[in-house]
């Protein structure tokens, strides 16, 4: 699971309403996005504890599209007219008519999405680049503002060998799953026949849905 976190700019009048608030996220080849799973959450605080609203792709508040280029995979998230209207004019935060700010002014937006690994990912210290560009524009402006951020995704592998102490037994009947004790989730993975390896595709809190490694 991956997150993009941004602080919405101040919105104080119709002249400062946002007419564009969009993200372009680029992940290096080896980390393709899992499509149709983007969630947007708005919070009153920077720590993301006081939630205002949650949007999914089916709500019509934003659009998510996916392409590829020489750099890797590209995901674009753009607010729709309905989404921008809520960001600009919602009364969920600034309820008093005398308040200067409106909508989700100065609130925190957290975008959550998922991606998986494949055999072209870089393992070890080199890492895999993941860049994001935020673009926004106001009603009273003829230009766009942009903000760029980046991170590196580091990947590692586990080489596990099954053995019976007496050298006997049917290894094909020995299965196991992987659990992260700290965050209390199980690993979901997909087997790549050509690479003879499993690649992590997600996680689940339901042990019955965890991948059974053989």
Could you describe each region identified by the protein language model?
Residues 1-214:
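Solvent-exposed loop/turn and edge beta-strand elements of beta-rich ligand-binding domains
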């Amino acid at each position: 699971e991956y997150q993009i976190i941004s602080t919405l700019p101040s919105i104080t009048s119709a002249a400062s309403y946002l007419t564009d608030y969009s993200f372009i996220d680029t992940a290096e080849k080896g980390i393709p996005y899992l499509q149709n799973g983007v969630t947007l959450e708005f919070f009153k605080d920077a720590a993301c504890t006081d939630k205002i609203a949650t949007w999914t792709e089916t709500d019509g508040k934003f659009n998510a599209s996916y392409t590829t280029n020489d750099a890797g995979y590209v995901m674009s998230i753009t607010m729709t007219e309905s989404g921008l209207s809520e960001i600009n004019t919602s009364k969920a935060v600034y309820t008093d008519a005398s308040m200067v700010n409106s909508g989700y002014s100065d609130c925190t937006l957290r975008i959550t999405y998922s991606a998986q690994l494949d055999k072209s990912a870089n393992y070890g210290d080199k890492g895999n680049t993941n860049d994001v560009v935020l673009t926004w524009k106001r009603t009273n402006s003829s230009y766009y503002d942009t903000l760029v951020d980046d991170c590196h995704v580091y990947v590692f592998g586990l080489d596990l060998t099954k053995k019976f102490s007496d050298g006997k037994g049917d290894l094909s009947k020995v299965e196991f799953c992987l659990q992260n004790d700290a965050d209390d989730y199980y690993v979901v993975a997909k087997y790549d026949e050509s690479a003879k390896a499993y690649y992590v595709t997600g996680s689940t809190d339901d042990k019955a849905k965890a991948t059974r490694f053989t």
